[in-house]
UniProtKB/Swiss-Prot annotation:
GO terms for molecular function: 5S rRNA binding; structural constituent of ribosome. Gene3D superfamilies: 3.30.420.100. This is Large ribosomal subunit protein uL18. Keywords: Ribonucleoprotein, Ribosomal protein, RNA-binding, rRNA-binding. Part of the 50S ribosomal subunit; part of the 5S rRNA/L5/L18/L25 subcomplex. Contacts the 5S and 23S rRNAs. Belongs to the universal ribosomal protein uL18 family. InterPro entries: Ribosomal_uL18_bac-type (IPR004389), Ribosomal_uL18_bac/euk (IPR005484). It comes from the Bacteria.
Amino acid sequence: MPSIDLQERRKQRLRFQLRAKANGRPRLSVFRSGRHIYAQVIDDAAGRTLAAASSLEKPLREQLRTGADREAASAVGKLIAERAQAAGVSAVVFDRGSYLYHGRVKALAEAAREGGLAF
């Protein structure tokens, strides 16, 4: 299917641009599925995840109606910002993957900025 190939090419192109701009900063990676949204702060130099959050976590599942809306993305953004700062990370590079900066991805990014992450 050509759409999968194009999506993969878009993701790789964006990831290459991020590596050039990163200057040693960790990457805030976003993955969204039909039912949930996930975020990770990844240190590519060390090859390890510094912080992670998702709408699957029990405290968020109890307070959210669903894991697939902008409200859930905002909650995950605030949570990833708290956890990243607890891990000593204050500046990141935002990796939206192959997703447009719109809707849930935008809500997560704005909540992470409000939570104190700089990007």
